[in-house]
A protein has these predicted regions:
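Membrane-cytosol interface at the C-terminal ends of specific transmembrane alpha-helices
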Residues: 144-202, 208-217, 268
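Glycine-rich helix-loop "coupling/hinge" segments at transmembrane-helix boundaries
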Residues: 147, 160, 219, 224-259, ...
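Hydrophobic positions within alpha-helical transmembrane segments of bacterial inner-membrane proteins
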Residues: 81-89, 93, 97, 139, ...
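Alpha-helical membrane-interface segments at transmembrane helix boundaries
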Residues: 67-75, 123-133, 215, 219, ...
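N-terminal, non-cleaved signal-anchor transmembrane helix
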Residues: 1-82, 86-90, 94-124
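C-terminal transmembrane helix and the adjacent membrane-cytosol boundary/short C-terminal tail
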Residues: 212-215, 253-278
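Membrane-spanning helices that line or support transport/gating and their immediate boundary helices
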Residues: 89-97, 171-178, 182, 221, ...
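Generic hydrophobic transmembrane alpha-helix motif, especially the helices
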Residues: 110-159
C-alpha cells in the first residue's frame, strides 16, 4: 500500500527542479542585485528619506485633504464593485454551460440543432467578453477611461467595474456550474420551466457564494482604487501622486496613514458582512 508514495515523490522531482531553474533564470534575466539595495549608501539614503517623512502633517488642511481622498476612494471602490456585479451576473449566466446548453436542465429535453448552436455561440461570446475584461489590469482600464471621459472618479469607477466584472463573471459562472442538482430535479418534477428553475433553483444556491466573492473583490478594489489615482482616476492615489511630485513628504505620510486606516476598516467591515450574510 505504501509503494506508490515514492513513485509519486519521484514524479514531482522534475517539476520542482524545473520550477527552481525557471526562477533562477528569471532572477538572472531581471538583473536583480540585492547587494545594491543593502549597501551602506542605499540604506543611508532610505533612512534619510524616511526621516524626511516624519512627523506627519496633522494640520487641518492636510487632514481634510486626506479625509476627502479616503472618502472618494471608498466611494469609487463601492460603486465600482456594484457596477461589477451588474456586469458579472448576466454574463455569468451566459457563460455557464450548465445553465445555457448542457447538464441537468437539458437531460429530458435537448434544444434543437440551431438553438443549441446559438446557445453555444452565446456562451462563447460571454466567456470572451469576460476574458477581455479581466485580463486587462484595472490601471490600464483606468488610463483608457481617463482619455475617454477625463480625469476624476468616473474613470476609476468604470475601470473597477469592467475588470472586476470580468473576474466575478468567471467565478459566478463556475458557481452556477457546480450547484446541487437535487433542487433542480425537484423543480423539474413540478413542471417548472427553465427560467423558473434558474431563478428558484440555481440562483438561491449560488447567492451565498456570489456575496462572498463580491465582498472579497471589494476588499481588493479598495486597494486598486487607491493606486488608480496615480493615473488621474481620483481618490487618495491622485493626492499621493501630487504630494510625491511636490516633495510634500510630511503630507505624504499623512496620506499613507489614511490609506492604511481606510483599508483596515474596509477589511473589517467586509469580514463582518461576510460573517452575517454568507
Amino acid at each position: 500500500m505504501a509503494a506508490p508514495a515514492p513513485r509519486a515523490g519521484r514524479r514531482w522531482w522534475p517539476v520542482g527542479l524545473g520550477v527552481a531553474a525557471l526562477v533562477a533564470w528569471s532572477w538572472h534575466g531581471t538583473r536583480v542585485e540585492l547587494g545594491a539595495l543593502l549597501s551602506g549608501a542605499a540604506l543611508a539614503q532610505i533612512a534619510a528619506y524616511l526621516g524626511r517623512l516624519f512627523p506627519p502633517d496633522l494640520s487641518a488642511v492636510a487632514l481634510r485633504n486626506a479625509a476627502l481622498g479616503a472618502w472618494e476612494t471608498f466611494a469609487i471602490s463601492l460603486v465600482g464593485s456594484g457596477l461589477a456585479c451588474l456586469i458579472a451576473l448576466p454574463l455569468a449566466v451566459g457563460a455557464s454551460a450548465t445553465v445555457l446548453y448542457r447538464g441537468v436542465l437539458y437531460e429530458r429535453r435537448r434544444p434543437g440543432p440551431l438553438a443549441g448552436l446559438l446557445r453555444r455561440a452565446l456562451g462563447l461570446a460571454s466567456k470572451t467578453v469576460l476574458a477581455v475584461c479581466r485580463t486587462v489590469p484595472e490601471i490600464v482600464w483606468a488610463l483608457i477611461f481617463v482619455f475617454v471621459v477625463g480625469l476624476g472618479p468616473l474613470p476609476g469607477v468604470l475601470a473597477l467595474g469592467v475588470h472586476t466584472g470580468g473576474v466575478l463573471g468567471k467565478l459566478f459562472a463556475e458557481v452556477l456550474d457546480d450547484v446541487d442538482r437535487a433542487p433542480i430535479e425537484a423543480l423539474q418534477a413540478t413542471g417548472a420551466g427553465r427560467l423558473a428553475i434558474v431563478l428558484y433553483g440555481f440562483l438561491p444556491q449560488a447567492l451565498p457564494q456570489f456575496v462572498s466573492y463580491a465582498l472579497y473583490r471589494w476588499e481588493v478594489n479598495i486597494r486598486a482604487a487607491a493606486v488608480m489615482g496615480f493615473v488621474g482616476a481620483g481618490g487618495l492615489g491622485q493626492r499621493l501622486y501630487v504630494a510625491l511630485n511636490l516633495f510634500h513628504e510630511h503630507e505624504l505620510l499623512t496620506l499613507i496613514a489614511a490609506v492604511y486606516v481606510m483599508v483596515t476598516l474596509v477589511d473589517a467591515l467586509s469580514a463582518w458582512l461576510r460573517a452575517r450574510l454568507v
